Amino acid sequence: MDILDKTIKKVSPDVYKTVEKEVLYFQNEFVGSDDLILQDDIFRVLEDIEDLSIIMFPVEDEEFCGFLFEYRGENFIYINTLLPFEKQIFTAAHELYHYLVNGKKEFLDLETIDEDKELDLEESKANLFAALLLVPKDALIKQLNLLKIKEAADLTILKIIKLMDIFAVPFKTIILRLFEIELLTEKQTEEWLDISARNPEKGILYQIKKHKIGERWQRKTKHVKLSNLKALIIDSDEMELLPEEKITKDLSFLVEVDADED
């Protein structure tokens, strides 16, 4: 299935408008503006939500992005920090949607972010929510004007990677947002999406390194943040709420993560 055939703007304009309203409500309630460019401030926004914590550490599986889970009554979003920073940011916004909608336990892989599999409406809505939150329409139009992009013919790879740097999002996210605001036609969008995004020898990643624009968002940060999960596991041990084998395994893993961070 073609990426555009899974894009909500094309598949269901009514659903698109609904998600737009959800993003606008969240921006007004938690961000303070509907045109603020968040970049990695998305993590601060998540941390400001009272009953939500973020856990971050690297996992040697770049197809595995993150997930939402509940542990002892507390909600956590896990993010794999072996991903490029831009995809960590997108993962955070994607999982935020699931938390806001229904607190659903949800595992996110790279195919879901890239939309390279059959349409899953909830996952597509989460991707759209993330894209609208990270690339607000008014902010995007303002940046297009600053870059003197008035029509599709004005777009160049250099301008695309500048937009990626400004909003700290992956290549496909920028291209799909340009389609959603109707700067690009379906055919033009497909032509842009045919360009390799992650090949370091050609395409977008090559141009990023060549021009040294937005390289910070390509870093695999390997950052470790355990929030209060370790304390919860220890408390569970003291209260005998978890099997001893599981507690030992969990604590061993967290000790290993702590050691890697040091």
What are the functions of these language-model segments?
Residues 1-262:
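Active-site hotspot residues in diverse enzymes, especially metal/ion-binding acidic/histidine motifs
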